[in-house]
Curated annotation (Swiss-Prot):
<dbReference type="InterPro" id="IPR001452">
    <property type="entry name" value="SH3_domain"/>
</dbReference>
<feature type="topological domain" description="Cytoplasmic">
    <location>
        <begin position="136"/>
        <end position="297"/>
    </location>
</feature>
<comment type="subunit">
    <text>Forms homooligomers.</text>
</comment>
<dbReference type="InterPro" id="IPR035522">
    <property type="entry name" value="Sho1_SH3"/>
</dbReference>
<keyword id="KW-0346">Stress response</keyword>
<feature type="topological domain" description="Extracellular">
    <location>
        <begin position="103"/>
        <end position="114"/>
    </location>
</feature>
<feature type="topological domain" description="Extracellular">
    <location>
        <begin position="45"/>
        <end position="54"/>
    </location>
</feature>
<feature type="transmembrane region" description="Helical">
    <location>
        <begin position="55"/>
        <end position="75"/>
    </location>
</feature>
<feature type="topological domain" description="Cytoplasmic">
    <location>
        <begin position="1"/>
        <end position="23"/>
    </location>
</feature>
<keyword id="KW-0812">Transmembrane</keyword>
<feature type="topological domain" description="Cytoplasmic">
    <location>
        <begin position="76"/>
        <end position="81"/>
    </location>
</feature>
<keyword id="KW-1133">Transmembrane helix</keyword>
<feature type="transmembrane region" description="Helical">
    <location>
        <begin position="82"/>
        <end position="102"/>
    </location>
</feature>
<feature type="domain" description="SH3">
    <location>
        <begin position="238"/>
        <end position="297"/>
    </location>
</feature>
<dbReference type="Pfam" id="PF00018">
    <property type="entry name" value="SH3_1"/>
</dbReference>
<keyword id="KW-0728">SH3 domain</keyword>
<feature type="transmembrane region" description="Helical">
    <location>
        <begin position="115"/>
        <end position="135"/>
    </location>
</feature>
């Protein structure tokens, strides 16, 4: 059995994804500052009190160093939807490490240890916020509200992202999915028995009975687009809905019906039923867009 394999491409990092997103800029800045406070205070506390110092705090600092870098890279490369599950798992581990470090440092009446504990408390607070953000669906009201403050930024992916993750399979060609159903008529010459006995139908057992209904002979009617199956979809004239793009999308160059759009771009939508919506951009360009990349306003 053959399966269609999705195409993967490396997304280029852009510092604008951090600067243009107030939430990402604020949380990463606070986390970095808290880590620096804990790092410096931990070294000072270890030098002043080397005997009873909890060395466990060093492992927490190393773990959070990689965790903050990972969050920065994921947000900068606009790959949140791809790695959000892994991020939530690592953030959960980091929350355990930071709270344990606070418990080991805050009870001593020593300035350096208390400063280190304060830094770990800030890290714990940022971690809780990150878990809520990355663990929520993009359509969740709190996350959609936070994302609404981010500037529009387009992801520059070298390969087109497939739709297998959202619906479990590839989308059929849209050029043949809108053809009207073909109509067929059959001529009835008499009453027929679907279960003949002895190979004889009801019409043969009593030939004197005239047929109850005889339909006029008709011909098979072909669909209007049967001669040209690759015809493009005719766009509608009314677009009563408005939707906001929660991810960037690059149209398939082999399908003329799809349109590309950037993250946070506003689109007009004519119909919200189905997996693909007929949409129109502000520039007037029309086409179909994946519904799981959009959120209604």
């Amino acid at each position: 059995m053959e399966y269609s394999r999705p195409q993967y491409g490396r997304k280029r990092m852009s510092l604008g994804n951090i600067i243009g997103d107030p939430f990402a800029l604020a949380t990463t800045s606070i986390a970095t500052l808290a880590w620096l406070i804990s790092f410096v205070a931990t070294i000072i506390a270890h030098i002043q009190y080397p005997v009873k110092f909890p060395l466990f705090a060093y492992w927490a600092l190393v773990f959070y160093f990689g965790l903050i870098i990972g969050v920065f890279v994921v947000v900068a490369s606009d790959s949140t939807q791809t790695y959000h599950v892994a991020l939530v798992g690592y953030l959960g581990c980091g929350l355990v490490l930071s709270t344990s470090s606070v418990n080991n440092l805050i009870h001593d009446n020593q300035g350096a240890k208390e400063a280190s504990a304060a830094g770990f408390i800030l890290l714990s607070m940022v971690t809780i916020v990150w878990i809520f953000y990355f663990g929520s669906a993009p359509s969740a009201v709190p996350r959609a509200y936070i994302d609404s403050f981010a500037l529009a930024k387009e992801s520059t992916s070298t390969n087109r992202q497939t739709m297998t993750g959202g619906y479990g399979g590839r989308r059929p060609e849209t050029s043949t999915s809108v053809q009207p159903p073909q109509m067929y008529t059959a001529q009835l010459n008499g009453l027929e028995n679907p279960s003949p006995v002895g190979g004889m139908t009801s019409a043969m057992t009593n030939p004197t009975i005239p047929p109850a209904y005889t339909a006029p002979p008709t011909q098979k009617t072909a669909a209007p687009n049967a001669e040209n199956p690759n015809a493009e979809i005719v766009p509608p004239t009314e677009y009563p809905y408005r939707a906001k793009a929660i991810y960037s999308y690059e149209a398939n160059p082999e399908d003329a019906n799809e349109i590309s759009f950037s993250k946070h771009e506003i689109l007009e939508v004519s119909d919200v039923s189905g997996r693909w919506w007929q949409a129109r951009k502000e520039s007037g360009e029309t086409g179909i867009a994946p519904s799981n990349y959009l959120i209604l306003l």
